[in-house]
């Protein structure tokens, strides 16, 4: 058990969870990638090499890197965790009671690293023993999925997010990602590094249907000084924002939550695809998110367990008030209109801050990286020709577990 605390977006990053590309991305095809929320298929080998460079860049900066597959494998060593995961991932109502029982029994005898591989990478009918016979098997093709792959586990930022002294285990918006949450619930409940830990679970760790109250970590920025910024995107709803805000206020972990409405389209999938915090007074932004007509509210406790909502004139004003600074500095996406749109699509604004003024980002975004450099921001470049095709940058691919405040 270790102490976990994330006090900001820009304080010294000390520990982070990543997920190296694996079997789940090998299951992506042109016919299923849209359903699995990818625009294209990736070269998994090259993506893995790029991810190794990313992870090693963090290690070279003295940051602890934990890999999701390792954490899940170690969690499966706990009998209760394995039983719970098999029950949640292999449903009687989806597979039928006899076939589901046979599959659970077969998976339970599997080496834990191999089982973890399937819990993220999926399982086809062609991979099960011929001795498992059932009408369900007889009516499916060998390439049909018993468990669908979870290629979006690559983006560890979204499934859970640590906020001050606690974590939100997020109810995901799209069916293709909802099973990811169970893997994280098991890790945070049973893995020795987290089990019995002195941290709060704000939201998402109950066996209920969260309906429209969805929330994803790419929309949550812990900007520090008692404030949290949340984007209401195509994935995170006002309902999800309210539940998280109430929990933060109940546990006295935040004084205000700033909620900003984002355009509902693919390029603005999450707040961090268009905006990240990179220094005390500095944000990287795609200009569309800071237009004067973008709606923004500040939520504070109303003293009766509810929320007080204040409409803000602009997002920039709300940030200046929350951070106690006179003027926020904005570094916009680089290049002309065409280059800026291309670089935003390739995650130029989705950088991971390691400490104030030092970020990791894709080397391909030359125009925006040049603007960072001129503004005194150090960019540690990583390749992203394959990783970037998943529509996520260094921030998307990382879940901070420990980070200093400001």
Swiss-Prot record:
One of its GO terms (biological process) is arginine deiminase pathway. Keywords: Arginine metabolism, Cytoplasm, Hydrolase. The keyword Cytoplasm applies. It is found in: Cytoplasm. NCBIfam families: arcA, PRK01388.1. It catalyses: L-arginine + H2O = L-citrulline + NH4(+). Its main location: cytoplasm. The active site is at 396 (amidino-cysteine intermediate). The keyword Mitochondrion does not apply. InterPro entries: Arg_deiminase (IPR003876). It comes from Salmonella typhimurium (strain LT2 / SGSC1412 / ATCC 700720). One of its GO terms (molecular function) is arginine deiminase activity. Its EC number is 3.5.3.6. GO terms for cellular component: cytoplasm. Pathway: Amino-acid degradation; L-arginine degradation via ADI pathway; carbamoyl phosphate from L-arginine: step 1/2. Belongs to the arginine deiminase family. It comes from the Bacteria. This is Arginine deiminase.
